[in-house]
């Protein structure tokens, strides 16, 4: 019994040590504005949905750009899928998935806050026709992760904006 309690002691001490050193879970960066408008996005854009999801609760997303402090304009929001490798029998063996997002941020008056920026993420994925359904799910998950990564990068750039 004593041996078991000695083995548990380090497990119980680890969270206390982590809390004592200032460790914190990653949070979205603080933004210096409270009203944002998203412009130029497709009606059901996964990127716009992810940006809304990641925005802190202190920022209100407005439908009208005129009443916002910052307007985030999507210039390009594209998901691409291309074949990288195939067999001599023309069966696909590897795909490359890309998410390309370009944007700029300005005030409703037209003052540029973030110049036009293009972000591109790519992931390679193996493919087998025998597992097509599983690979389709994996592809969706990779696109979702890349979209979340790009949204995080956009928010970091918006955090540097000074009005």
Can you annotate each of these PLM segments?
Residues 133-163:
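C-terminal/domain-edge helix-coil "capping" segments
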């Amino acid at each position: 019994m004593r041996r078991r309690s000695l083995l548990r002691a380090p497990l119980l001490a680890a969270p206390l040590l982590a809390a004592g050193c200032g460790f914190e879970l990653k949070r979205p960066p603080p933004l210096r504005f409270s009203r944002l408008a998203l412009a130029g996005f497709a009606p059901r854009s996964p990127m716009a949905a992810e940006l809304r999801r990641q925005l802190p609760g202190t920022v209100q997303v407005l439908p009208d750009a005129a009443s916002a402090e910052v307007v985030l304009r999507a210039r390009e929001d594209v998901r691409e899928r291309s074949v990288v490798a195939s067999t001599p029998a023309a069966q696909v063996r590897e795909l490359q998935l890309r998410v390309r997002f370009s944007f700029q941020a300005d005030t409703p008056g037209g003052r540029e806050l973030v110049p036009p920026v293009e972000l591109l993420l790519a992931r390679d994925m193996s493919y087998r026709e025998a597992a097509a359904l599983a690979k389709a799910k994996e592809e969706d998950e990779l696109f979702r992760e890349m979209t979340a990564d790009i949204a995080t990068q956009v928010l970091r750039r918006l955090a540097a904006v000074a009005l």
